[in-house]
Amino acid sequence: MSTNITFHASALTRSERTELRNQRGLTIWLTGLSASGKSTLAVELEHQLVRDRRVHAYRLDGDNIRFGLNKDLGFSEADRNENIRRIAEVAKLFADSNSIAITSFISPYRKDRDTARQLHEVATPGEETGLPFVEVYVDVPVEVAEQRDPKGLYKKAREGVIKEFTGISAPYEAPANPEVHVKNYELPVQDAVKQIIDYLDTKGYLPAKKE
């Protein structure tokens, strides 16, 4: 960590922001194998939250981020760790501004996801509580993901063209206790998104739906 720095707290508390914006900030963290459907769910989830529930939500997509913020990172374990660390920090900033951050990253290592959770749940200076962190396990068997393979990545991994590919030559550590477990090989997209939104409603994270 850098030295000789000071954290400057806002003049607004999080509760004041929540009251003024009529919205709680949180992060929805979608994790799962490549081709599990994370990005597809994230796109539809963002669409429904913004269009139907009238809340501020924004996607942070695993591929999109590597076009800019994380374009300097590869796919070694160290780079994957740094990839997730950066995204966790960015997602927290969105959540702290009372927006809903929707991240869709393979995030294969449990310790990295746990670190992202802790980053949110530990209160920052000037705040009494942390931020909600909703882990969504987008679950498909590797055989199903490999059959889908829209980018041809599994084929390249099997051929040895791609090294350290999650699910083939690198591990994926499934969440032990995710807030939402979506079996994305059984459900249509709309039903999977409904499962996530129903959880958010149950926890009181969303304002009441406007008729």
UniProtKB/Swiss-Prot annotation:
Picking any one GO biological process from the record gives: hydrogen sulfide biosynthetic process
Origin: domain of life: Eukaryota
EC numbers on record: 2.7.1.25
Q: Name one GO molecular function term.
A: ATP binding
Binding of ATP, residues: G32, L33, S34, A35, S36, G37, K38, S39
InterPro entries reported in the protein's UniProt record: APS_kinase (IPR002891), P-loop_NTPase (IPR027417)
Q: Which residues form the active site?
A: S107
- GO cellular component: a single term: cytosol
Stated family:
Belongs to the APS kinase family.
Subunit: Homodimer.
Q: Which PANTHER family match?
A: BIFUNCTIONAL 3'-PHOSPHOADENOSINE 5'-PHOSPHOSULFATE SYNTHASE, PAPS SYNTHETASE, ISOFORM D
What is the protein name given in its UniProt record? Adenylyl-sulfate kinase
